């Protein structure tokens, strides 16, 4: 062995291994071992890349779930409050014109109308919008046909009466509009 090369020669290694049982001697070369280590390293790199990708996918999914939860958190409450808005609207519609002009009822009517406007404003601020229905073709994704009525004025399949207003919350249906649809007269 030279001073510059501290690695033992093959002859020195063979001399050292004399007397050691054959099944205990590792005869793999450095190249084989290096190739095996490189393969293990590549496998580990792939595993790390897959783990990173999975982590990113989980993070994106969680961010979407959180965004959806924020956007649609009021859905249950909004459905419940729609009946209040419906009843207020019906109450206003049921007040006869002569009572609306009566001094005794003017303030009451004005208060009910202001409450209706406030409900619409709150709905709007939470992304809740009324679905357009009157005069439009029936859209099964937004309208629920309750009855068909003969009509000479409207095309068959056109909404001619809104029985109950429908609402969307952001891009999701909160409640379909209950409508009457035109059909050909008999």
UniProtKB/Swiss-Prot annotation:
GO biological process per UniProt? protein folding
The cellular location(s) given in this protein's UniProt record come to: Cytoplasm
Q: What GO MF terms are annotated?
A: adenyl-nucleotide exchange factor activity; protein homodimerization activity; protein-folding chaperone binding; unfolded protein binding
- NCBIfam families per the UniProt record, alphabetical: PRK14140.1
Which family does the record assign?
Belongs to the GrpE family.
Summarizing the function annotation, the protein's role is: Participates actively in the response to hyperosmotic and heat shock by preventing the aggregation of stress-denatured proteins, in association with DnaK and GrpE. It is the nucleotide exchange factor for DnaK and may function as a thermosensor. Unfolded proteins bind initially to DnaJ; upon interaction with the DnaJ-bound protein, DnaK hydrolyzes its bound ATP, resulting in the formation of a stable complex. GrpE releases ADP from DnaK; ATP binding to DnaK triggers the release of the substrate protein, thus completing the reaction cycle.
Give the protein's recorded name.
Answer: Protein GrpE
Lineage summary: Bacteria, Pseudomonadati, Pseudomonadota, Alphaproteobacteria, Sphingomonadales
């Amino acid at each position: 062995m030279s001073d510059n090369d501290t690695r033992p020669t093959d002859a020195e290694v063979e001399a050292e291994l004399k007397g050691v049982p054959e099944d205990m001697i590792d005869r793999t070369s450095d190249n084989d071992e290096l190739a095996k280590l490189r393969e293990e390293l590549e496998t580990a790199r792939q595993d790390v890349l897959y783990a990173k990708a999975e982590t990113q996918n989980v993070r994106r999914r969680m961010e979407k779930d959180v965004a959806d939860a924020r956007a649609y958190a009021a859905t249950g409450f909004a459905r419940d409050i729609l009946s209040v808005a419906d009843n207020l609207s019906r109450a206003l519609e049921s007040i006869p014109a002569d009572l609306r002009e009566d001094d005794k009822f003017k303030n009451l009517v004005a208060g009910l109308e202001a409450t209706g406007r406030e409900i619409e404003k709150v709905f709007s601020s939470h992304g809740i919008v009324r679905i357009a229905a009157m005069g439009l073709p029936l859209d099964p994704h937004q309208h629920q046909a309750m009855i068909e009525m003969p009509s000479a004025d409207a095309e068959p399949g056109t909404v001619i009466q809104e029985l109950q207003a429908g609402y969307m919350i952001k891009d999701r249906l909160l409640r379909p509009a209950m409508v009457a649809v035109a059909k050909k007269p008999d």
